[in-house]
Structures are given as C-alpha cells and as structure tokens.
Design a protein with these regions (language model features):
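Terminal helix/beta-alpha structural elements that buttress the NAD(P)+-binding lobe
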Residues: 1-176
Length: 176
C-alpha cells in the first residue's frame, strides 16, 4: 500500500480500524473510514475521510473517494461491509477481513486472524514482523496513538467486560 492507493477501512473508529488508518496514512495512502457520525471528528484527526455506515454506504464512499478505492480493510464484518467491498474492488486479494475469517474464502477475499481457517502465510508473518518496529517508532514519535478508555481497578473486571460489550470508545485499562 502506498501513495497511489485509496483504502476503505470498515469500522475505522475501532481500535484496529484506527491502527489501520494511521498506518495507511503514514504510508501515504488516501483513507476513507466508516464510523458513526459521532466519531467522524476523531477520524479526521487521524487523517481519514469519514463516512457514515448504513443505507447508501456504497454511494457515500464513491462520493468521498478522490479516485477508485483500491484496497479494503474490513474490521466490521457486516454483510454491508462485505457487499460494498466487493462492489468497489475487483481484485479480491486487495480485500481483507479480520472479522469474517471463516467466510473469507467463499467471498474470495483475504482473512487475517478473526477465525480464519487458514494460518498466516510466510509473507503475512513477515508483514507482522516488519510492522512491529515501525509501530514502536511511530508510537515513540507521537505519530501513532492508541485511544485509551476508562481505567478501572482489577476488582472491577466484570464492569470492564460490560463496557467492552457496550462498545465504549478506547482500550479499557485494568490496574492492580
């Protein structure tokens, strides 16, 4: 992925989606990210063009994109996300999901973790290894951020799970 790419990130305001946005922006790609309107300002701060998910998503993405979408990262796993992805990108090797792993082969797309029945290839393992030092470098420079949510004592772990299930923004931190 690079400056000639337009990446669509489904669930761009989630933790993994935010990471995908930041990496793609660092590599020079144009990024369009789906999220609820309440999260659009945050996506703009990360360098993405936000679009609301829901009815009409395909048209909104096409309207927002400066050129054709060339790559898709699916962190949502919804039927809408898959359908829009398949409509936008002909090269199925450039569509990846972390959520619909068991279904990926039936769509002809890539699965990364997320229940994929296929282990990571050597190339994919190399990508992960290559990403770690780059991530540390970006974190150290302040060019990569991880959104933190509430900090709770370990004794409130059950409450932390409730917050995760309620989709509270940011990573919840449990402390001893």
């Amino acid at each position: 992925m690079g400056p000639d790419d337009v990446l669509l990130v489904h669930a761009g305001s989630g933790a993994v989606g935010q990471a995908a946005v930041q990496f793609a922006v660092a590599w020079g790609a144009t990024v369009i990210a789906t999220a609820s309107p309440s999260r659009h300002a945050q996506l703009r701060e990360l360098g993405a063009i936000p679009v609301a998910y829901g009815d009409g998503l395909l048209e909104r993405v096409r309207d927002a994109a400066p050129s054709d979408v060339t790559v898709v990262f699916d962190g949502a796993g919804t039927d809408e996300a898959i359908e829009v992805s398949l409509a936008l990108v002909a090269d199925r090797d450039r569509i990846g999901t972390i959520v619909r792993g068991p279904d990926a082969a039936s769509f002809g797309i890539r699965a990364f973790s997320g229940g994929s029945p296929v282990p990571l290839t050597d190339e994919e393992q190399a990508w992960r290894a290559e990403a770690l030092p780059k991530t540390i470098e970006l974190l150290a420079s302040g060019d990569f951020v991880i959104e933190l949510g509430p900090e709770l004592p370990l004794a409130e772990a059950a409450r932390a799970h409730e917050l995760v299930e309620a989709h509270v923004a940011g990573k919840i931190v449990l402390v001893p």
